[in-house]
Swiss-Prot record:
Domain of life: Bacteria
One GO MF term: proton-transporting ATP synthase activity, rotational mechanism
Name by which UniProt lists this protein: ATP synthase subunit alpha
Gene from which the chain derives: atpA
Assigned EC number: 7.1.2.2
Catalyzed reactions per annotation: ATP + H2O + 4 H(+)(in) = ADP + phosphate + 5 H(+)(out)
Membrane topology type: Peripheral membrane protein
Family annotation (PROSITE patterns): ATPASE_ALPHA_BETA
Subunit structure: F-type ATPases have 2 components, CF(1) - the catalytic core - and CF(0) - the membrane proton channel. CF(1) has five subunits: alpha(3), beta(3), gamma(1), delta(1), epsilon(1). CF(0) has three main subunits: a(1), b(2) and c(9-12). The alpha and beta chains form an alternating ring which encloses part of the gamma chain. CF(1) is attached to CF(0) by a central stalk formed by the gamma and epsilon chains, while a peripheral stalk is formed by the delta and b chains.
InterPro entries recorded: ATP_synth_asu-like_sf, ATP_synth_asu_C, ATP_synth_asu_C_sf, ATP_synth_F1_a_nt-bd_dom, ATP_synth_F1_asu, ATPase_a/bsu_AS, ATPase_F1/V1/A1_a/bsu_N, ATPase_F1/V1/A1_a/bsu_N_sf
Endpoints of the signal sequence: none
Any one GO cellular component localisation term in the record: proton-transporting ATP synthase complex
Organism whose genome encodes this protein: Sodalis glossinidius (strain morsitans)
Role noted for this protein: Produces ATP from ADP in the presence of a proton gradient across the membrane. The alpha chain is a regulatory subunit.
Residues where ATP binds: G169, D170, R171, Q172, T173, G174, K175, S176
Length: 513
């Protein structure tokens, strides 16, 4: 075969013309130390605070300490095979998690990867875990309720859409049970739920997921998990990841509810990271920015106005407000609410529900202490019927507590005092409620009406629970339409008052409890 020199030169020219030098600029550094999930990297001059650093083996770390000649970063995942001298790169990206409706009904880890063994995740994009909270002008006042299904909470400590209400108490006082029942109660309300489990046992979380599924609430819920066996970095970031998933619904004119269970464990994880990064410790060895840790998270829970939603969706959604309601949980030690983290979160939130171990052990469940529990903005969100009928409950309980303490020392009590004590005991008994049995607005209203109008005074204390159960069965059977009407409108007028009175008069006459 004979080669033509002209052809060869043309071929070479063609190849030269086609040759394209692709240059890739990236900021590269070297690991100088690895210990306890923390790496120190030399040479990353242009790294950002919170930036993802690419590590060998398709892993990454997050830059938290930017020092003069090195960067302190926390590894997201296993770090046993990392060694000094390994090369790492800047990615130019902040940590993002998948968001969207495809996450509903799924159990995911902090990074948004599914861990429930089901089909691959479908999502509508990614959202940064750290986001700036909506400004004052973009917000709207809280005036719509979130019904927890608990009589004691919805009557005395009402929660509104866009509110932050702290659930605080010692271990084993029913904090998680209250939050999970609030999720179960949203299954028909249209409110999307996010449950963030931080530092809990995997078996406990599996039980929660099973209960949500049994009660038909999992399809409406995203469960974000950072178990006790996972790294402190994943436990620290889990609430922010869950919040980003909740903001997806808020920014599109929908309502969402997020539970952080619990922020005490997140603060401990952050303290661990900060001490390993050699940051100076402060009170209780927490770093100086532990208040900011929780404030920047909880400020993202808000109710945004229709203009914000319209601008965010570029006009696709009009005339709708969005909300993200937060129920953070804090665990106290022996009822000490003056510790560092509890006082911080109390000052950030719009109210708190105190659960007490002595009430829990006395069989009063939910173990809410109405004297020191408060909702600062939820009162404006209560439905008309609940506002009208719940007013006397808090007063009755306050008077009962005062008189109960006094009556221990008094030998003879007048009739008025004895009547008040009896009424207080009946109301306390009436507010008891079993787990996984949330009540509708109409059911709560009927029970509160019975308490306020004296229908319980001649019912034995031990029979109050039976009275309530029989009453619920009776109205479901005889007055389903009225109950449906109250649930839909939340209104209270002379007609509804007369109907409730008629129901209770007829039911009392049957003596069927």
């Amino acid at each position: 075969m004979q080669l033509n020199s002209t052809e060869i030169s043309e071929l070479i020219k063609q190849r030269i013309a086609q040759f394209n030098v692709v240059s890739e600029a990236h900021n590269e550094g070297t690991i100088v130390s690895v210990s306890d999930g923390i790496i120190r990297v030399h040479g990353l001059a242009e790294v950002m605070q919170g930036e993802m650093i690419a590590l060998p083996g398709n892993r990454f770390a997050i830059a938290l300490n930017l020092e003069r000649d090195s960067v302190g970063a926390v590894v997201m995942g296993p770090y046993a095979d990392l060694a000094e001298g390994m090369k790492v790169k800047c990615t130019g990206r902040i940590l993002e998690v998948p968001v969207g409706r495809g996450l509903l009904g799924r159990v995911v880890n902090t990074l948004g990867a599914p861990i429930d063994g089901k089909v691959p995740l479908e999502h509508d994009g990614f959202s940064a875990v750290e986001a700036i909270a909506p400004g004052v002008i973009e917000r709207q006042s809280v005036d719509e309720p979130v019904q927890t299904g608990y009589k004691s909470v919805d009557a005395m400590i009402p929660i509104g859409r866009g509110q932050r209400e702290l659930i605080i108490g010692d271990r084993q006082t029913g904090k998680s049970a209250l939050a999970i029942d609030a999720i179960i109660n949203q299954r028909d309300s249209g409110i999307k739920c996010i449950y963030v489990a931080i530092g809990q046992k995997a078996s406990t979380i599996a039980n929660v997921v099973r209960k949500l599924e049994e009660h038909g609430a999992l399809a409406n819920t995203i469960v974000v998990v950072a178990t006790a066996s996972e790294s402190a970095a994943l436990q620290y970031l889990a609430p922010y990841a869950g919040c980003a998933m909740g903001e997806y619904f808020r920014d599109r004119g929908e309502d969402a509810l997020i539970i952080y269970d619990d922020l005490s464990k997140q603060a401990v994880a952050y303290r661990q990271i900060s001490l390993l990064l050699r940051r100076p410790p402060g009170r209780e060895a927490y770093p100086g920015d532990v208040f900011y840790l929780h404030s920047r998270l909880l400020e993202r829970a808000s109710r945004v106005n229709a203009e914000y939603v319209e601008n965010y969706t570029k006009g696709e959604v009009k005339g709708k407000t969005g909300s993200l309601t937060a129920l953070p949980i804090i665990e106290t030690q022996a009822g000490d609410v003056s510790a560092f983290v509890p006082t911080n979160v109390i000052s950030i939130t719009d109210g708190q529900i105190f659960l007490e171990s002595n009430l829990f052990n006395a069989g009063i469940r939910p173990a809410v202490n109405p004297g020191i529990s408060v909702s600062r903005v939820g009162g404006a969100a209560q439905t008309k019927i609940m506002k009208k009928l719940s007013g006397g409950i808090r007063t009755a309980l306050a008077q009962y507590r005062e008189l109960a303490a006094f009556s221990q020392f008094a030998s003879d009590l007048d009739d008025a005092t004895r009547k008040q004590l009896n009424h207080g005991q009946k109301v306390t008994e009436l507010l008891k409620q079993k787990q996984y049995a949330p009540m509708s607005v109409a059911q709560q209203a009927l029970v509160l009406f019975a308490a306020e109008r004296g229908y319980l005074e001649d019912v034995e204390l031990a029979k109050i629970g039976d009275f309530e159960a029989a009453l619920m069965a009776y109205v479901d059977r005889e007055q389903g339409e009225l109950m449906q009407q109250i649930n839909q409108t939340g209104a209270y007028n002379d007609y509804i008052e007369g109907k409730l009175k008629g129901i209770l008069d007829t039911f009392k006459a049957t003596q069927s409890w």
